[in-house]
Amino acid sequence: MDILKYAKERHIRVIPEIDIPGHSRAAIKAMNARYQKYIDTDQSKAEEYLLTDFADTSQYLSAQNFTDNVINVAMPSTYHFLEKVIDEIVQMYQDAGVELTAFHVGGDEVPEGIWEGSSICRTFMQENELTNIRDLKDYFLEQILEMLDKRTYRQSDGRTLL
């Protein structure tokens, strides 16, 4: 919050970024640890923000040489997690007295092979009449942009920055 206030005093606009669905290894690892913490006592709480399908057999290598840094966009818990993060960022801007005018969601560097081995993704694609992985990614980004629109500010999807 101090950074936001400091920037505002100097007429600098800070644009938050959640680079998704790729570049998400830290979030995935953190939510996997949360899952392990709660799975024996509260399955619902364990799965609340889960970002990965443990049965996914997809094989890929990201530009950063990771094989586990892309969130599963077919899981309701992924959207729940992103709503939580976005709402926390919105609240931080409000608390700092800074207008949130843009939001960057990334969308780049999603490696070939992602989601192909996820039965959750296959089922989701069938239910939503998506024909390929590109359609799934586009569907996800549209959902995120709608999520941001509901919070009344502009967004950027990694192809253009407002």
Each language-model region and where it sits:
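Surface-exposed extracellular loop regions of Gram-negative outer-membrane beta-barrel proteins
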Residues: 154-162
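Substrate-binding cleft of carbohydrate-active enzyme catalytic domains
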Residues: 1-151
